[in-house]
């Protein structure tokens, strides 16, 4: 429908067929579609993983997001192995603060479990983080089954959200070794070292652990 939109302090105050606001600045977009800013809830900016760094940092990635109509990104704060959740969150804030062109938030990666990390979960909630990520592969980030069980149990108590990257790391490593030994190092070998049945096995294992 055709309408005027009154905005103040980044909030929509009113939508009506015709709005009189003499003190307002008028931006004429007649004939255009007016959409709310999109939210990209899965970005990996400035992430060091598998001996490389993702293509975009917070500046270039958020700038591209804005050009496409995305005004909020939710990235994954990833502590280095042995670090606390607080240290991981502080590191990602340093990467984003002053560089990100749009609004941003974080999911928190859990790669281990101990009494300190368990206590930090409450702190993450206090900091506005209620969604978490765990990896069943990638040595620098992966979590073991025992730790994953305890983490899922805690997040269930908190009513949190947990995303899990589901793959069977051990079998993937075995398949990679076989391809290397056969000299099959091309891009085409990548999906063959990560067949779908390994994802299915990991998803099944995750669900059974979560239901324990």
For each feature predicted by the language model, list its residue ranges.
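Divalent metal-dependent hydrolysis catalytic cores, especially in the metallo-beta-lactamase
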Residues: 59-83, 97-112, 127-140, 159-163, ...
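Histidine-rich, glycine-flanked metal-binding segment
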Residues: 1-36
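Metal-associated gating/positioning segment near the N- to mid-region
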Residues: 29-99, 116
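Residues that cap or flank secondary-structure elements
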Residues: 52-53, 84, 112, 143, ...
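Histidine/acidic residue-rich metal-binding segments in metalloenzymes
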Residues: 116-212
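Short, structured secondary-structure boundary patches
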Residues: 77-78, 88-102, 151-156, 182-189
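Receiver (REC) domain switch-region micro-motif
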Residues: 26, 39, 132
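Short Asp/Glu-rich motifs
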Residues: 24, 77, 83-85, 115-116, ...
